[in-house]
C-alpha cells in the first residue's frame, strides 16, 4: 500500500516537473517571438525613415550549416564524358588544373571550381541545336545543375545545395555553328563535414544592409525579397567551404550579406 502511494506521488511529481518545463519553454518561445516582432517593427520604421520599402514577409528561418567539401575528380570525369562523350584522355596540368579531351573537344576543371568546355558537334541525324540541348542537359545532370534550356543558341543553368542556391555557381552554354561551349563554376567537391555557423537572422542581415546603403550612397528604394543562399569559398590548396548568406533582392539589383562576418557585396 505504502509502495503504491509512493509510486503515485513520484508520478505526480514527474508530471508537475514536465508541466513546469513545458510552461517554461512556452514562455521562452513567446518571449522570443515577441522580441522578434518588436525588432521587425523597429526595423520597418527605420527603413521607412530611410526611404526604403520592405516586403510584407520577412523570413524567420535560421541559416543552414556551414559545409566543407573536398574535390571529387571522379565527378569531374563524369561531367566531361557527359558532354564530350566517351574515350576521354586525362591530363594533369598541375596547379590544380585537370583536362579531359577526346577527338571532339576538351573540358578543363580548376581547383577553385571553375570550368570551361569546347566541343565540336559531329555531323549526324540530329541538328546541332538538338545535340547541344542533349549534351548540355547531360552535363548539367552530372554537375548537379538545374536543367538548362537553349534559346537562340544560348542558355544557362544554376546550382543548388541542400535546396539553397549557390551564389556564383552555374553554367552558361553557347552554340555557334557546330561548336558548343560551356563555362562557369560548380561545386567540384564531395561532402566532407558540416558545422554550425553564425546564426544571423534576416532582421540582422537587413540592418547590416541598411547600414551599407547609407554608407555607400547606393540608390535603393525597395527591397523586394529576402532569401537564404550559399557562398562558396575555395583555393587551390584548401577544401571548398559553403557559408550561408542572405540574398537581398532590390529594385537596383541583388546584394549578399554574409552570415560569417556580416559583409555586404553585390550578388
Regions found by a protein language model. Give the residues of each.
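N-terminal trafficking/processing presequences and adjacent post-cleavage segments
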Residues: 103-126, 180-205
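Acidic, serine/threonine- and glycine-rich low-complexity intrinsically disordered segments
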Residues: 127-187, 193-196, 200, 219-224
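Extracytoplasmic/luminal low-complexity segments enriched in Pro/Gly and acidic/polar residues
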Residues: 179, 187-267
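Generic marker of "main functional regions" within proteins
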Residues: 33, 39, 50, 57, ...
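Exposed beta-strand-loop-beta-strand "reactive/processing" segments of non-cytosolic proteins
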Residues: 74-112, 116-121, 144-178, 227-259
Amino acid at each position: 500500500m505504502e509502495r503504491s502511494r509512493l509510486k503515485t506521488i513520484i508520478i505526480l511529481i514527474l508530471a508537475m516537473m514536465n508541466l513546469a518545463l513545458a510552461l517554461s519553454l512556452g514562455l521562452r518561445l513567446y518571449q522570443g517571438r515577441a522580441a522578434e516582432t518588436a525588432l521587425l517593427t523597429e526595423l520597418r520604421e527605420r527603413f521607412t525613415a530611410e526611404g526604403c520599402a520592405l516586403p510584407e514577409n520577412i523570413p524567420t528561418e535560421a541559416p543552414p550549416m556551414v559545409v566543407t567539401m573536398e574535390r571529387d575528380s571522379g565527378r569531374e570525369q563524369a561531367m566531361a564524358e557527359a558532354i564530350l562523350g566517351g574515350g576521354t584522355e586525362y591530363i594533369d596540368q598541375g596547379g590544380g588544373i585537370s583536362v579531359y579531351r577526346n577527338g571532339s573537344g576538351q573540358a578543363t576543371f580548376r581547383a577553385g571550381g571553375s570550368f570551361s568546355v569546347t566541343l565540336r558537334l559531329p555531323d549526324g541525324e540530329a541538328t546541332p541545336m538538338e545535340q547541344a540541348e542533349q549534351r548540355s542537359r547531360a552535363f548539367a545532370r552530372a554537375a548537379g545543375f538545374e536543367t538548362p534550356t537553349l534559346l537562340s543558341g544560348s542558355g544557362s543553368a544554376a546550382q543548388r545545395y541542400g535546396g539553397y542556391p549557390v551564389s556564383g555557381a552555374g553554367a552558361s552554354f553557347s552554340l555557334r555553328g557546330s561548336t558548343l561551349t560551356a563555362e562557369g563554376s560548380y561545386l567540384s567537391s564531395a561532402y566532407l563535414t558540416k558545422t554550425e555557423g553564425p546564426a544571423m537572422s534576416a532582421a540582422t542581415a537587413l540592418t547590416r544592409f541598411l547600414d551599407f546603403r547609407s554608407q555607400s550612397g547606393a540608390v535603393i528604394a525597395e527591397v523586394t525579397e529576402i532569401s537564404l543562399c550559399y557562398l562558396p569559398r575555395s583555393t587551390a590548396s584548401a577544401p571548398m567551404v559553403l557559408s550561408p548568406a542572405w540574398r537581398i533582392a532590390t529594385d537596383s539589383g541583388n546584394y549578399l550579406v554574409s552570415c560569417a562576418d556580416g559583409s555586404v557585396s553585390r550578388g
